[in-house]
């Protein structure tokens, strides 16, 4: 059956044709723009803005606007965008992903759509993967925008709010994904509109879009607060799981493919004895089951120096797609605390979640989203389904001359690494630069030791040593350079060939292991052969590589043994084996996509609720008039719920005392309503009596606060306090609910449907609690006039 998303993806030739037509139209204005003086060229910005206000669309302005900023690029930077870069710019303006090979000038390409989309004045955000690139691109490309009369802002994580606000007030703002994501969350915790910093989510252009939209999509952005100390539970769970034995007939099993671990029946029995409980999976033990599950995963599915490093007494995650340390990022659901318990370092409080959002749902809030990267085609179905973006492969300006050699496969790791070192030695002796890609810190350090023994000078770039990343990567194309880098360290920095290197064959790229994503392998290859340079790439693999162990190495091993290829130095170049490896990668990519999709499905439930709550907060903060029209209906609904709850059955059985208690606790300070006042009254009469009481109390406070602004601020404070308190509690409730349904999913339940159903009632209860608290806080507040 054909994937319905696949059917929606346009034919590549047809895609390119429409963008080539726009490039033709842009190039037709080249001479006209070149003939203008600087002042005349700069005046084009105001002309375009005026034409836009008078009804022309950005699509209609595109050819001239692109031609104008293209000419500005030439005058300011000395760089004139090629035709293929115009095509890339048109793809980006269309709200799609432009796949452009390494060295094809993505940053320069971006000047055209960024300039065009900044003309309406609603703000353009250019998002990068790190602060170095944010500042570098803003400084370099900012010269062009300033020349054309547009303002540029830079938003960094640690900036004070007034600087952030100024940055977002600019026509074009450069920022990292985490900085703007956290700004958005903090804006929706603000108490006044003046505290907010982000102006609007209009048009975003994402650099290294695959890294941000796909690789980072599983980890939500979380703003946390302090909570009860639960360190003891992490430590006890860690001590328990360290007593267990692995195996289906033992205590636990590990799913290496999914990076999960589960107790067997025998393990469950051991847990019940260890923790002195009757049934581990009773509802009352849901939290304990979660602690044990996270401890199992931390100890047996994640590994030091591969998934994380321990530095300065802290556990720091390694980004599996870049090899860098992910500063400030922590695993959610208690997994990070489980790492800390495992490693014996200080356990940092889990805290309550004050606000959270996935990057997927954050970027989907923009009116238009676009991105550029060197590799995205393998993920085009996901990008189409999640973000409604096409992936368009932009032609290279020069033909790619890099030669991608077939993989070579060894029986074991020793044979593979010996071959890698021999190949590096051969290339080093003739002066050809080598970039060696590794998947883990361990591998990079092992190779470094082997090269030291051979007397081969080299640089190592990994999560433990990334301070001079851009400098090391930039030098990797010089004669005789040998650079070992985990994954795609140095993305965004060009590797230019030194003098005479092209004659030696260009940059040689050696992969020491296939990554679980074909896209990351393609990125490593793409470091060589930029702008028509020569180069070559080859991957060296072994049956003991992680990917092979996880996916069917046994079958390949048997085949190699039948071919008498089972000693250290045996090497295989076999199409069937290469196909098996690609098949394994596709399986992992599918699993990772399923995981990201699951994260999105759960967060989509929260997204709908979050948008309602955040919109409500915004309306309250924006209000300059009394909020009576919002507040009094809240009070009436609260009265209805309380009265209805205590007037079921026959009238003689009504719980009038509880209604009076509600009045005393939430409506009135005078105690003027008693049970006797309610006796004999109908349900409707009781409600009307309480409505009247609430109205009198409301208008009494309005009279006491004769200053209109004071009254509005008082109403805002009460409402925002209630909303925030219960929303934060709701986030924690939803986290616990998700953990609970995931644990119960070991039965026959569909956890997502369970979650959606329970989330609806949990949300409704939160709304009821907000309205009750708003009623109580407002009505019982003692109003004192400010004395002047």
From Swiss-Prot:
Which EC number(s) are documented for this chain? 7.4.2.8
Q: What is a single Pfam family found in this protein's UniProt entry?
A: SecA_DEAD
Supply the alphabetized keyword list. ATP-binding, Cell membrane, Cytoplasm, Membrane, Nucleotide-binding, Protein transport, Translocase, Translocation, Transport
Q: Which GO terms describe its molecular function?
A: ATP binding; protein-exporting ATPase activity
Q: Would the keyword ATP-binding turn up in this protein's UniProt record?
A: yes
InterPro entries named among the record's database cross-references:
Helicase_ATP-bd, Helicase_C-like, P-loop_NTPase, SecA, SecA_CS, SecA_DEAD, SecA_motor_DEAD, SecA_preprotein_X-link_dom
Q: Which residues bind ATP?
A: 85, 103-107, 494
Q: Which reaction does it catalyse?
A: ATP + H2O + cellular proteinSide 1 = ADP + phosphate + cellular proteinSide 2
Instruction: Fill in the subunit field for this protein.
Output: Monomer and homodimer. Part of the essential Sec protein translocation apparatus which comprises SecA, SecYEG and auxiliary proteins SecDF. Other proteins may also be involved.
Query: What is the annotated role of this protein in its UniProt record?
Result: Part of the Sec protein translocase complex. Interacts with the SecYEG preprotein conducting channel. Has a central role in coupling the hydrolysis of ATP to the transfer of proteins into and across the cell membrane, serving as an ATP-driven molecular motor driving the stepwise translocation of polypeptide chains across the membrane.
Q: Provide the family line.
A: Belongs to the SecA family.
Q: Indicate what this protein is called per its UniProt record.
A: Protein translocase subunit SecA
Which species is this UniProt entry from? Oenococcus oeni (strain ATCC BAA-331 / PSU-1)
Q: Give the organism's phylogenetic lineage.
A: Bacteria, Bacillati, Bacillota, Bacilli, Lactobacillales
